[in-house]
């Protein structure tokens, strides 16, 4: 299969992966309305083409939390990467490191902190959930600090798991799930050989290290299901802020008031995110939520965004809507499942090229020049109502 665009990786991954794994990463909550809107709303953001601007000295470089990034992109936290490629977290981290951008290790990674951190030169970021087992949280933070992780991404939009109906149909959960997964695995030989056999162990490394015993997929589902904490409040985060002496980012913000609370709390950054449409179906897409949040806190806190970003044009759109940097999720996982480290490296090259084209044709020589003035209404379709204020005065 020829890979000429970032979107090609999704189709390639679907051919390689057992259905339970493909649909686990590809699916969302309930009827998947928000999952669809994440992509569709972002694609409806029209860019403003400008010409004859002498774009010979264009640069994608930016700085975030005193880290230099080759472009305003980081690989976001995605669980179970090691089920999609052999030691997947290590491969993805190496690709990000080579490209000069951060990699974020998920709490529920297959490869533990101690395996991933030494594999790269750049300090990685670490993502942590709010869990009932505070002992695990403290243990994970201590290990992340010891491994030299620079930034903590604290995910707060998961006090309870979302209802993901597609998982029951695909075999990730539901009746006879283990047998269904086995049958799917043996009928997908490329994955079975490369990952299923040679990618072992398939423990959840960070959890296994704490529990002191191997943890497989069933353990992962059961342990997490029993450990999400619906009682969490801002007050519960205070000990983490005191313990962690590096930048702390609150992930899962969709409302301007929550963004203001993050500023008052003393967070260094927020991620405007609906968990990729995997938690509460029917909430705003990140693209719709971002402008109002940027209007409320831009300049007071670093604004990151995820959910729906599939290519370099989407990165430019998110920045024009108010983000400082974006996180990739499914986009890099599709590439990882298709071709491992080389796939992620190629995806990042594609995104960089697409960003350069978009910036050249919108007259933005640097990331700081991508603003609301880079957006335009019209071209046969108005921007969604929640996005229109960002393009005020730019009607074509």
UniProtKB/Swiss-Prot annotation:
<dbReference type="GO" id="GO:0009060">
    <property type="term" value="P:aerobic respiration"/>
</dbReference>
<dbReference type="InterPro" id="IPR037396">
    <property type="entry name" value="FMN_HAD"/>
</dbReference>
<feature type="binding site">
    <location>
        <position position="164"/>
    </location>
    <ligand>
        <name>substrate</name>
    </ligand>
</feature>
<keyword id="KW-0285">Flavoprotein</keyword>
<dbReference type="InterPro" id="IPR012133">
    <property type="entry name" value="Alpha-hydoxy_acid_DH_FMN"/>
</dbReference>
<dbReference type="InterPro" id="IPR020920">
    <property type="entry name" value="LldD"/>
</dbReference>
<protein>
    <recommendedName>
        <fullName>L-lactate dehydrogenase</fullName>
        <ecNumber>1.1.-.-</ecNumber>
    </recommendedName>
</protein>
<dbReference type="GO" id="GO:0010181">
    <property type="term" value="F:FMN binding"/>
</dbReference>
<keyword id="KW-0472">Membrane</keyword>
<dbReference type="GO" id="GO:0004459">
    <property type="term" value="F:L-lactate dehydrogenase activity"/>
</dbReference>
<comment type="similarity">
    <text>Belongs to the FMN-dependent alpha-hydroxy acid dehydrogenase family.</text>
</comment>
<keyword id="KW-0288">FMN</keyword>
<comment type="function">
    <text>Catalyzes the conversion of L-lactate to pyruvate. Is coupled to the respiratory chain.</text>
</comment>
<dbReference type="InterPro" id="IPR008259">
    <property type="entry name" value="FMN_hydac_DH_AS"/>
</dbReference>
<dbReference type="Pfam" id="PF01070">
    <property type="entry name" value="FMN_dh"/>
</dbReference>
<keyword id="KW-1003">Cell membrane</keyword>
<feature type="binding site">
    <location>
        <position position="251"/>
    </location>
    <ligand>
        <name>FMN</name>
    </ligand>
</feature>
<feature type="binding site">
    <location>
        <position position="155"/>
    </location>
    <ligand>
        <name>FMN</name>
    </ligand>
</feature>
<feature type="binding site">
    <location>
        <position position="127"/>
    </location>
    <ligand>
        <name>FMN</name>
    </ligand>
</feature>
<feature type="domain" description="FMN hydroxy acid dehydrogenase">
    <location>
        <begin position="1"/>
        <end position="380"/>
    </location>
</feature>
<keyword id="KW-0997">Cell inner membrane</keyword>
<dbReference type="GO" id="GO:0005886">
    <property type="term" value="C:plasma membrane"/>
</dbReference>
<feature type="binding site">
    <location>
        <position position="129"/>
    </location>
    <ligand>
        <name>substrate</name>
    </ligand>
</feature>
<feature type="binding site">
    <location>
        <position position="106"/>
    </location>
    <ligand>
        <name>FMN</name>
    </ligand>
</feature>
<feature type="active site" description="Proton acceptor">
    <location>
        <position position="275"/>
    </location>
</feature>
<feature type="binding site">
    <location>
        <begin position="306"/>
        <end position="330"/>
    </location>
    <ligand>
        <name>FMN</name>
    </ligand>
</feature>
<dbReference type="InterPro" id="IPR013785">
    <property type="entry name" value="Aldolase_TIM"/>
</dbReference>
<keyword id="KW-0560">Oxidoreductase</keyword>
<feature type="binding site">
    <location>
        <position position="278"/>
    </location>
    <ligand>
        <name>substrate</name>
    </ligand>
</feature>
<dbReference type="GO" id="GO:0006089">
    <property type="term" value="P:lactate metabolic process"/>
</dbReference>
<feature type="binding site">
    <location>
        <position position="24"/>
    </location>
    <ligand>
        <name>substrate</name>
    </ligand>
</feature>
<dbReference type="InterPro" id="IPR000262">
    <property type="entry name" value="FMN-dep_DH"/>
</dbReference>
């Amino acid at each position: 299969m020829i890979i000429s665009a970032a979107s090609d990786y999704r189709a390639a991954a679907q051919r390689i992966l057992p259905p339970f794994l493909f649909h686990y990463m590809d699916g969302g909550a309930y009827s998947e309305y928000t999952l669809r809107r994440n992509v569709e709303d972002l694609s409806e953001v029209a860019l403003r083409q400008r010409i004859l601007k002498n774009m010979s000295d264009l640069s994608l470089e930016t700085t975030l939390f005193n880290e230099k990034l080759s472009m305003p992109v980081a690989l976001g936290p995605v669980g179970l990467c090691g089920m999609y490629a052999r030691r997947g977290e290590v491969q993805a981290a190496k690709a990000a490191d080579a490209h000069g951008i951060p990699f974020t290790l998920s709490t529920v990674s297959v490869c533990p902190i101690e395996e991933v951190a030494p594999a790269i030169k750049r300090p990685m970021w670490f993502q942590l959930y709010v869990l009932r087992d505070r002992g695990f949280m403290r243990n994970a933070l201590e290990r992340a600090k010891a491994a030299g992780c620079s930034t903590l991404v604290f995910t707060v939009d998961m006090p309870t798991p979302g209802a993901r109906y597609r998982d029951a149909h695909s075999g990730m959960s539901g009746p006879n799930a283990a047998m269904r997964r086995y049958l799917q695995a043996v009928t997908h030989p490329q994955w079975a050989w490369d990952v299923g056999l040679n990618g072992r162990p398939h423990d959840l490394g960070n959890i296994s290290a704490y529990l002191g015993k191997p943890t497989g997929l069933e353990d992962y589902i059961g342990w997490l299901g029993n450990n999400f904490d619906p009682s969490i409040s801002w007050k519960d985060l205070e000990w983490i802020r005191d313990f962690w002496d590096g930048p702390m980012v609150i992930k899962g913000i969709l409302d301007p008031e929550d963004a203001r609370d993050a500023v008052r709390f003393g967070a260094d950054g927020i991620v405007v995110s609906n968990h990729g449409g995997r938690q509460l179906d029917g909430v705003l897409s990140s693209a719709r939520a971002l402008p109002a949040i940027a209007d409320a806190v831009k300049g007071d806190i670093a604004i990151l965004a995820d959910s729906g970003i599939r290519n370099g044009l989407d990165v430019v759109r998110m920045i024009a809507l108010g983000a400082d940097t974006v996180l990739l999720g499914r986009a890099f996982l599709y590439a990882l499942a298709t071709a491992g480290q080389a796939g992620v490296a190629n995806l990042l090259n594609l995104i960089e090229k697409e960003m350069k084209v978009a910036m050249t044709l919108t007259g933005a020589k640097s990331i700081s020049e991508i603003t609301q003035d880079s957006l335009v209404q019209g071209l046969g379709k108005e921007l969604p109502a929640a996005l229109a204020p960002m393009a005020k005065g730019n009607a074509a």
